[in-house]
Amino acid sequence: MSGLTLASFLRTSGVACVVLERIDRARVEVRQRAGVVDARAVRMFEQWGLADKLLAGPLAQTIDYRVNGVGRIFETIEDDGSPGRFCTQQMLVNNLLRELIDVMAGDIRFSVTDVSIQNDEDRRPRVSYSDAAGAHEFVCDYIIGCDAEHGVSRASIPDGVLTKYSHDFGYAWLAALVEAPVTGHPIMGVSDHGFVAQLPRGPHRSRYYLQCALSDGPADWPDTRIWDEIRLRLCDNTIENAVVHDKDFVPMRSVVYAPMQYRNLFLVGDAAHLLPPTGAKGMNLALYDVDVLAQALVRAARDHDRAALDAYSSTVLPHIWKYQEFSAWMTDTMHDAGDPTQNGTFRQMAARACLDNLFDSPTAARLHSEYQRGLN
């Protein structure tokens, strides 16, 4: 997603670029991805002139926070009229592919393997790769690593250059895509039995997230258990079973690598930082990286001015750490407020008081809205 977005911004600005993608277009188009486009990202697409072409889905303005089955609707405070959208990452990727390839005639090469990076100090960067036609190599000015946690970009940086900051929360989420739409508002729920969330994934489907053990796998969660736990954690016996299309297990953890650049290689999104999905900020932080980097690359290409590029890491990291803190707070609060065997009844009651604050304190509500919208 971040690579396609960056390429679209550069192409719009007249800056040439090549996108290497390890899988074919058909698989890219159907691959399921989580994410909601926050208000800051909507504003970003508007500023690049692509919002009308890329964004779709209902406005993301409300969350139903439920404690032991009792729901309260949190409405984000929008002083500037810039709401987020429930445009899923899969929908955004498909729109980006159509715009970049079919409209802009951008250069994207699918099904590549054996990607290798040469980022030497005394010559221009080189990238080599293979595809069905054979081996290839090209020379470029900059390499942008949008290849996620296990890609070749960060791995190409010598040992000792980057510092890794990480935290493991000690539990995981089961993410289940189901044939059942969200009938009201998106849900973030807790009960003494644990955490559960339901978020929309198109008009007919939704994705449920259930707190589980790090050691759990598909054999531990047959479909019947998934629905039993959803009913139990939402305290709602009227919820009916539906088809479960897929199940993923996501460990709750946070990671930041710094700096996010080395010579002419720049890291973006999951290649540089990971967040627990509780705050829905992973995709939006990647889009923030893309926005800052795209502006810097355009400035370097048009004006031969590298100042913004050289300052890329120091520009984006303070924002990333703010949202790491927000995501950690959301994760701790939503899970401490649930199953008391997690961290005890004191932490449970303190976390539930934090949730009460969102509805009792205008100051807390405004701050929470700023983070939800990506505008803090």
Task: List the predicted regions and their residue ranges.
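Conserved mid-domain beta->alpha element of the FAD-binding
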Residues: 1-12, 16, 20, 97, ...
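Residue-level detector of anion-binding/catalytic polar loops
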Residues: 16-17, 51, 107
